[in-house]
């Protein structure tokens, strides 16, 4: 392995995001049972466009409720127009103004399965100071390098502030995240405060959460994995990429099925 240790690699990763002029990505979030089987109903596709100083667009797509041939994919987004931030969640059916971009990103963390926060915490200085970013991972160590989707990557492992295991695969050439994988242990029982928080955003997802937790009789272990398939920095982004249109069909839908 090269002479860089885990702390060096994470610092370089942070600087890459911090110093870039623009950033784009398209990703897929997958959830896996402890036996390695994907829970397909929890799959989420998303994309992020960012251009300094304040152009930001984040969109994500969840599977249809009911028959995929008849039902609509659930498309949600948040974006900026000058100093104002807006959001459109599938469950809300209308565009709403947000108090701030940072608050909008935090609000979307649960429904986007954590994807809205992962890279944004590095790109936005105002957000970086408010959240527990990956730089605060403890017991961080470098493992053997690995190939992910044909890309040569550093492979790191550590623990989050809640003691969950977390792994990172970081593209060597661009020093950008290629994959993040977090271990999650869920104990039986319904967290009523979490249920109410989800319900305030999306009643359907709150119902799904309650039904799932009511069916759980013992602690279960999951893995939440985010794969970054088209991440790039300092690239040209068209003005239309920062615009959300309620009636427009999301170009993430094909990615949802094939990535």
Predicted regions and their residues:
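N-terminal mature ectodomain segment of secretory-pathway/periplasmic proteins
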Residues: 2-94, 141
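Flexible, processing/modification-adjacent segments and terminal tails
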Residues: 2-9, 16-19, 71, 79-152, ...
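Gly/Pro-enriched, hydrophobic low-complexity segments
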Residues: 30, 64-65, 133-256
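Short, surface-exposed linear segments at secondary-structure transitions and domain or protein termini
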Residues: 52-53, 58, 104-113, 178-179, ...
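Short, charged/polar low-complexity linear motifs in solvent-exposed/disordered segments
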Residues: 42-43, 68, 76-77, 97, ...
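Short linear sequence motifs
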Residues: 10, 16-17, 43, 49, ...
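Short C-terminal domain-edge/linker segments immediately following a structured domain
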Residues: 56-60, 90-94, 119, 185-191, ...
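Glycine-rich, flexible loop segments associated with nucleotide phosphate handling
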Residues: 41-45, 71-77, 119, 209-226
């Amino acid at each position: 392995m090269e002479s860089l240790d885990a702390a060096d690699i994470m610092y370089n990763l942070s600087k890459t995001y911090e110093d870039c002029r623009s950033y784009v990505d398209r990703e897929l979030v997958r959830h896996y049972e402890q036996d390695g089987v994907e829970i397909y109903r929890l799959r989420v596709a998303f994309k992020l466009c960012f251009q300094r100083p304040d152009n930001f667009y984040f969109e994500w797509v969840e599977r249809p409720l009911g028959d995929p041939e008849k039902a609509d994919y659930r498309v949600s987004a948040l974006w900026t127009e000058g100093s104002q931030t807006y959001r459109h969640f599938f469950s809300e059916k209308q565009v709403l103004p947000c108090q701030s971009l940072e608050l909008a990103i935090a609000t979307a963390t649960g429904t986007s399965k954590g994807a809205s926060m992962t890279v944004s915490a590095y790109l936005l200085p105002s957000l970086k100071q408010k959240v527990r970013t990956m730089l605060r991972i403890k017991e961080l160590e470098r493992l053997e390098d690995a190939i992910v989707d044909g890309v040569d990557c550093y492979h790191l492992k550590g623990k989050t502030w809640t003691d969950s295991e977390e792994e990172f695969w970081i593209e060597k050439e661009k020093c950008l995240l290629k994959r993040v994988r977090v271990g999650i242990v869920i104990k039986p029982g319904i967290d009523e405060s979490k249920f109410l928080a989800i319900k305030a955003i999306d009643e359907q997802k709150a119902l799904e959460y309650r039904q799932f937790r009511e069916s759980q009789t013992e602690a279960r272990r999951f893995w939440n994995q985010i794969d970054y398939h088209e991440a790039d920095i300092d690239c040209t982004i068209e003005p239309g990429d920062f615009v959300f249109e309620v009636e427009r069909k999301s170009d993430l839908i094909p990615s949802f099925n094939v990535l």
